[in-house]
Amino acid sequence: MQKTYDAHDIRFDIPADWQGNFLAEYQQHGEGDTAYEATVFSCHIGQNDVMVMTIAAFGEKQWETIKASSPDAAKMEFATSKDGKTHYTLRIEDQKMDTEADQKVYDTIRAAAQSLSGKITITK
């Protein structure tokens, strides 16, 4: 049965390779013009929880600040809120594991994250 992640204005079908091995952590960062919210998605591999992807949400003022300071920001943007005031970015991590077996697991989980491109819905 397909499970859905639906929290903090983000919705997507959880990839089969993540089922039963999935942690989403909501975080708030910074203040003022640098404040933003992020949801970090991790999976357990070996003895560690390993970050797989991050979806961040930036208000208009914060978005302009981030775009000015990071040339990659615009490339990572995948959606805006319905009112156009919140900008969402998607970052797929590229971690290196200590063992070949753990790396194969990570690569499978990362590929599942990449398959979400274009399938993540912003609900607000």
Question: How would you label these PLM feature ranges?
Answer:
Residues 2, 7, 13-61:
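Secretory pathway targeting signatures of secreted, lumenal, and periplasmic proteins
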Residues 12, 16, 111-114:
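Solvent-exposed, polar/charged alpha-helical surfaces in well-ordered, non-transmembrane soluble domains
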Residues 12, 87-88:
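Short, isolated positions in well-ordered beta-strands
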Residues 22, 65, 99-100:
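Short acidic, gly/pro-rich beta-turn/loop elements at beta-sheet edges
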Residues 73-82:
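Short, surface-exposed beta-strand/loop micro-motifs that present aromatic residues
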Residues 90-124:
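Surface-exposed amphipathic alpha-helical segments
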